């Protein structure tokens, strides 16, 4: 069966490099499933989970918290260039919980002072923290 090579790259280096038979990511237009021999494509990614179903007898599924970036699909090679990315097994849940609480406090404070830019920034931080928490539970 044809498989794809999947790489997730961040400014800190390669976070993931495996073969897969199916990938699921979220773009601004919604969830996108990717199978081998997919058309060539470049698309932006949302802060969301990435599901990678590997081939083989065990049908292993890997989960990665993707915090924005782009996906490029070309000739059965899928490359994700992300601002940051963490595999489910690598997520520090207590740190993510603290980031969630901090973002919630910042949202409340920014809304009180009507600081729109600060509200937006804190909401992005909250989405990232919630994404990491959700992926850690997979």
From Swiss-Prot:
Any one GO MF annotation of this record? ATP binding
Q: Which domain of life is it from?
A: Bacteria
Q: One Pfam family from the UniProt entry?
A: ATP-synt_DE
Keyword Membrane in the entry? The reply is yes
Give the subcellular location: Cell membrane
State the annotated membrane topology for this chain.
Peripheral membrane protein
Which UniProt keywords are given for this protein, alphabetically ordered?
ATP synthesis, Cell membrane, CF(1), Hydrogen ion transport, Ion transport, Membrane, Transport
Q: Which GO terms describe its cellular component?
A: plasma membrane; proton-transporting ATP synthase complex
Tell me the subunit arrangement: F-type ATPases have 2 components, CF(1) - the catalytic core - and CF(0) - the membrane proton channel. CF(1) has five subunits: alpha(3), beta(3), gamma(1), delta(1), epsilon(1). CF(0) has three main subunits: a, b and c.
NCBIfam families documented for this protein? ATP_synt_epsi (TIGR01216), PRK00571.1-3 (NF001846)
Report the HAMAP family cross-referenced here.
ATP_synth_epsil_bac
**Family statement:** Belongs to the ATPase epsilon chain family.
* Protein role: Produces ATP from ADP in the presence of a proton gradient across the membrane.
Q: What is this protein called?
A: ATP synthase epsilon chain
Name the species this protein comes from. Streptococcus pyogenes serotype M5 (strain Manfredo)
Gene behind the chain: atpC
């Amino acid at each position: 069966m044809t498989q794809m090579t999947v790489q997730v790259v961040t400014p800190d280096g390669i976070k993931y490099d495996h073969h897969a038979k199916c990938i699921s990511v979220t773009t601004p237009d919604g969830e996108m499933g990717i199978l081998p021999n997919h058309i060539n494509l470049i698309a932006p990614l949302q802060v969301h989970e990435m599901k990678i179903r590997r081939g083989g007898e065990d049908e292993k599924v890997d989960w990665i918290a993707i915090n924005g970036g782009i996906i490029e699909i070309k000739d059965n090679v899928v490359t994700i260039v992300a601002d940051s990315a963490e595999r489910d097994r690598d997520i520090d849940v207590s740190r993510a919980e603290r980031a969630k609480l901090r973002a919630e406090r910042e949202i409340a404070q920014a809304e009180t002072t009507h600081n729109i830019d600060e509200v937006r920034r804190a909401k992005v931080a909250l989405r990232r923290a919630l994404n990491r928490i959700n992926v850690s539970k997979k």
